[in-house]
Amino acid sequence: MAPKRKSGVSKCETKCTKACPRPAPVPKLLIKGGMEVLDLVTGPDSVTEIEAFLNPRMGQPPTPESLTEGGQYYGWSRGINLATSDTDDSPGNNTLPTWSMAKLQLPMLNEDLTCDTLQMWEAVSVKTEVVGSGSLLDVHGFNKPTDTVNTKGISTPVEGSQYHVFAVGGEPLDLQGLVTDARTKYKEEGVVTIKTITKKDMVNKDQVLNPISKAKLDKDGMYPVEIWHPDPAKNENTRYFGNYTGGTTAPPVLQFTNTLTTVLLDENGVGPLCKGEGVYLSCVDIMGWRITRNYDVHHWRGLPRYFKITLRKRWVKNPYPMASLISSLFNNMLPQVQGQPMEGENTQVEEVRVYDGTEPVPGDPDMTRYVDRFGKTKTVFPGN
């Protein structure tokens, strides 16, 4: 008898018992820096690079340029003056290193601001380094000699406390005020102090974190580094990086290369959005101090910083509705007046009545009626 062919389906076949899992959907719409972030703009002109540098602001301004009338101190501070007592500490403004900052204007992207979506520049990455570290090898100047007895050896190089911070953002850097001693008397002419912002003398809370002592880095060479620090509670639209090395004889340590790129994107893949077609750069680079030979006076030394920023275009939802633009236009046409206070703590407004719809005539028109915070109508009955 001939062999019978086996019937049925091959046993090697396996059926999928259940559907394959699908990736869970994730939110595409992000709100970043006050903007609703949409897709990227693609194309040959959607990426641009900008190179710039910031010079140090150690206390001595760029002018005068004469090397005999103060220009020789550019890049340095003037001699640091010590306090005579705990209650008499008044440093000179030209001895205080301050923040360097600048705003780079970017090409305009939107001719029509009435559209639902707008294009905006987004900072993607930055290459940066401190320039001029080789100048610290100068050991033949008129500084304090290493052999103080015979005035021989070499000139003491720059050394001491070092502070390096740089920031790239779509808005000015947010700063938090914090000082070592609230009794310090900073001069308000020429620099921005905590008293300049709060209009009050410093208090003990300014030696820790005082929530009201905040500012924005909106002026170059005006915000002392020992007073103003990057605010970690803000700066959502800014990236900052920094390090500090303390000590009276700490040697400067610097690494420099043109191959290191710092990515500015956050965990959602979005970088600082440049509002108003402008990107803001900020930095401080303090290398230490030099000690003069005659009077043992200390001068802070700062170096410039180079930036190369890469930006790309991104679509965002228009944050400026036409109603608000027209409203601000009409409001700006009205004259600005300064009258008596009608808002705030010293308001002179006694009573405000708001009517909505109609109702039967009440028997007691003076009865207090109001709507509470939950939207319910309340009536206060008169007492005896």
Curated annotation (Swiss-Prot):
Pfam families: Polyoma_coat (PF00718). The keyword Transcription does not apply. Residues 322-384 are annotated as: C-terminal arm. The lineage of its organism: Viruses, Monodnaviria, Shotokuvirae, Cossaviricota, Papovaviricetes. GO terms for cellular component: host cell nucleus; T=7 icosahedral viral capsid. Signal peptide: none annotated. A motif (Bipartite nuclear localization signal) lies at residues 4-18. This is Major capsid protein VP1. Its main location: virion. The modification Phosphothreonine is found at residue 358. It comes from Murine polyomavirus (strain Crawford small-plaque) (MPyV). GO terms for biological process: caveolin-mediated endocytosis of virus by host cell; virion attachment to host cell. The keyword Amino-acid biosynthesis does not apply.
